[in-house]
UniProtKB/Swiss-Prot annotation:
Homotetramer. Its EC number is 1.3.8.4. It comes from Caenorhabditis elegans. The lineage of its organism: Eukaryota, Metazoa, Ecdysozoa, Nematoda, Chromadorea. PROSITE patterns: ACYL_COA_DH_1, ACYL_COA_DH_2. The gene is acdh-6. Pfam families: Acyl-CoA_dh_1, Acyl-CoA_dh_M, Acyl-CoA_dh_N. Pathway: Amino-acid degradation; L-leucine degradation; (S)-3-hydroxy-3-methylglutaryl-CoA from 3-isovaleryl-CoA: step 1/3. Its cofactor is FAD. This is Probable acyl-CoA dehydrogenase 6. It catalyses: 3-methylbutanoyl-CoA + oxidized [electron-transfer flavoprotein] + H(+) = 3-methylbut-2-enoyl-CoA + reduced [electron-transfer flavoprotein].
Length: 408
């Protein structure tokens, strides 16, 4: 079974410059992808197997390398170390970070670049951005986004973690669940209730909380189905005291800030999934070409050809939908429905690709040292995280319904 020992090749950027203009990328995007591909191939992928086995990767070491490359600087203010580049650069980076040989590190990186820092970059005070944003852009600090709770996942308005005023400080109590980077993070962007107002969409604030604060406790890393080397914990806040100036932007606007960045988070998730799913298909074709069964290779079987062809077509359609959505977003259009469609599609396609490719590999695909097995475990989260499939369908139908009402 020599195929099990085959060295996985790092995928190059999904697209390269040519005489045909790319839909959303230009030369700087390709240059960033090439630089990132080189770093992943030389510094990250050689260590992935060991990090996955140990259940932890060195976030500060990896983030510092990525920070020096400018991965965390996109869409961030130049005054705080950002590059101010467009959202298409975020997608170019997210797409290329998918070349990492596991889902754990891309997810962890995207938390810092596209989840914990956007609201801070846009609405935070100068002092907050100097304290938390600048070193996060440089890769000196690792951050988490802390929104979900044990009883509040899709229903963000139902969170119970609260903060009460004590002079010029906030006293925070509650807990947060499924916190990516939580065991290694230096600080977290935390959504808390800051008033008892009945309007659950206007009583919440985003607060920067240093995770070495007195009263912050972390669970042992959670034992997950996939994303093994990404540390995920439950955070507990027991009378945690921070300055009220650590509130990002306006008090009571936290829910709105969080909702506004969900679209970008979801598009980044779609981008991250493209290369790994392409890799699953490509590696399965290689294996099927070598594997003999009943005197023929698996790839000679028409049903295998049809299955792989369909997966390729669906992946290309998803890629095209992503690019169309990003282009519309960069032009200022409302892309809530398109984003929900793309996010729904990548989640379902991830399950389909990894399941059907694993089926072609058979027993060999069931072994943990096979990349197909890891992909099967890692990318199941795409239908759950950043908005589950059911929420995406609600968003799509809401837009459908409004559209039809206008026609009546």
């Amino acid at each position: 079974m020599a195929f099990l020992a085959r060295k996985t090749s790092s995928l190059l950027p999904a697209t390269t410059s040519s005489t045909v203009k790319h839909m959303i990328y230009d030369e700087p995007h390709f240059a960033m992808q090439n630089s990132l591909a080189k770093l992943i191939k030389e510094k990250i992928n050689p260590n992935v197997a060991q990090w996955e086995k140990s259940g932890r990767y060195p976030a500060h070491f990896v983030f510092k390398m990525l920070g020096q490359l400018g991965v965390f600087a996109v869409n961030k203010p130049v005054d705080y170390g950002g590059t101010g580049r467009d959202f298409a650069m975020s997608i170019a980076i997210a797409e290329q970070i998918g070349a990492v040989d596991c889902g754990s590190i891309p997810m962890s990186v995207m938390v810092q670049s596209d989840m914990s820092t956007p609201a801070l970059a846009q609405f935070g005070s100068d002092s907050l951005r100097n304290r938390f944003l600048r070193p996060s852009i440089n890769g000196d600090l690792v951050s988490s986004i802390a929104v979900s709770e044990p009883h509040a996942g899709s229903d963000v308005s139902a969170i119970r973690t609260h903060a009460r005023r004590y002079g010029s400080d906030l006293i925070i109590n509650g807990s947060k669940m499924w916190i990516t980077n939580g065991d290694q993070a230096d600080w977290a962007c935390v959504l808390v209730n800051t008033s008892n107002a009945k309007n659950l969409h206007k009583n919440k604030s985003l607060v920067c909380i240093p995770l070495d604060s007195i009263g912050v406790h972390r669970s042992t890393p959670l034992d997950k189905l996939g994303m093994r080397s990404s540390d995920t914990v439950q955070l507990f806040f027991e009378d945690v005291r921070v300055p009220s100036s650590y509130i990002i932007g306006e008090e009571g606007r936290g829910f709105a800030y969080q909702m506004n960045q969900f679209n970008d988070e979801r598009l980044v998730t779609v981008a991250v999934g493209l290369l790994p799913l392409q890799k699953c298909i490509n590696e399965t074709i290689e294996y099927a070409r070598e594997r003999l069964i009943f005197g023929k290779t698996l790839l000679d079987q028409q049903y295998v050809q049809f299955r792989l062809a369909e997966l390729e077509a669906e992946l290309e359609a998803t890629r095209s939908l992503l690019y169309r959505t990003v282009l519309a977003r960069c032009q200022g259009e409302d892309v809530s429905m398109l984003t929900a469609m793309a996010k729904l599609k990548i989640g379902r396609l991830a399950r389909k690709v990894t399941d059907q490719c694993l089926q072609i590999w058979g027993g060999a695909g069931y072994l943990n040292d096979n990349g197909i097995s890891r992909a099967f475990r890692d990318f199941r989260i795409f239908s759950i995280g950043a908005g589950c499939d059911e929420v995406m369908m609600q968003i799509i139908h809401k837009t459908q319904s409004k559209r039809q009402q206008k026609r009546i």
